Every structure is written in C-alpha cells, then in structure tokens.
C-alpha cells in the first residue's frame, strides 16, 4: 500500500529505504511493486549496528503497518533522535517525535513527507522523540520502573511477599 501511495504522489526527490530482516514472499511482493522505480531501495539482513547507522543517517523513519502495538522500529528512531511517521495504530498516538497519519491516503502521506523535508521540523520532532525515549524507554528508565514495581509489592508491615527479599538483595548487581 505504501509503495502504491508513493507512486501516486508527487514525491520525486525522496529515496525510501526499506530495512528488511529477511527475504520472503512479502519482500518479493515489495520488489515487484517497486519495479525499477529509483525512489525505493531494499536492504536485507543488515547487522544491528548497520541498522542503527542507517536510521541515524535517515531524515525520517516510516512505519506503514496497522498491526504494530508498540513498534520497535519507531522506538529505535526515537532513540536516535530521528523523526518518524506512521498510520494511527496501537500506541503510536502516545509517542512523541513523529507524525501520526489519521488518514492513510496518498495525500496524507505526501503531506507528512513534505513536512519532514523541513530541517527545523525534523530537528524539533527528533529531539522530542529522543527526550521521551530517554525518559520512558531507555534501558535505565525501564530498569528503574521495574525496580519501583517490584519493590512496591513489599507489604507495609515489613513482611515481604514470597521472593521479594531475594530480588531486593540481588537486583543492584544485575
């Protein structure tokens, strides 16, 4: 659907890079839909560090899935300070640093992409996403939330529930 929308749009000066973990039937359908259109490139099986480098070198990250509840690709973009855009699915509307497409039409896609061609807009969104990632999704933030949750289960009278005293003793060394 995304490839068809781009092909119907007036977006001519933008290259869309697909980072695909494996070549499969869906990827082959994408290749057929792309044909010889020079606006699209597919990279398969990149090592983790190269995926991060590709994201950091991008102007924006796009997710065109309606089935993701909390997409890791968007969280990766946020961690790199790269703006993103995606259809309104799952928890995307609660994330900062991107544009949620309320309407999955070629014109909505074109408008979002065109807005992200502005460097000030990209920097503003990217920094908002990075701040939210650091506060809520970075490993230190997640560990702190888990620690608070685990320790909140200790009973007020000082009698810990089963295993919480073991967790308290060993958590700082984990």
What name fits each language-model region?
Residues 14-28, 44:
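Glycosyltransferase donor-sugar binding loop
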Residues 28-49:
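Nucleotide-activated donor-binding/catalytic signature segment of Leloir-type glycosyltransferases, i.e.
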Residues 52, 71, 75-79, 90-93:
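Short alpha-helical segment that forms part of, or immediately flanks, the ligand-binding pocket
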Residues 53-58:
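Short alpha-helical donor nucleotide-sugar binding micro-motif in glycosyltransferases
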Residues 61-62:
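A short hydrophobic beta-strand element within the catalytic core of glycosyltransferases
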Residues 66:
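Aromatic "clamp/platform" in nucleotide-sugar-dependent glycosyltransferases that forms part
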Residues 86, 98-107, 114-120:
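Conserved acidic donor-binding segment of nucleotide-sugar-dependent glycosyltransferases
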Residues 120-151, 163:
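A charged, aromatic-enriched C-terminal amphipathic alpha-helix characteristic of glycosyltransferases
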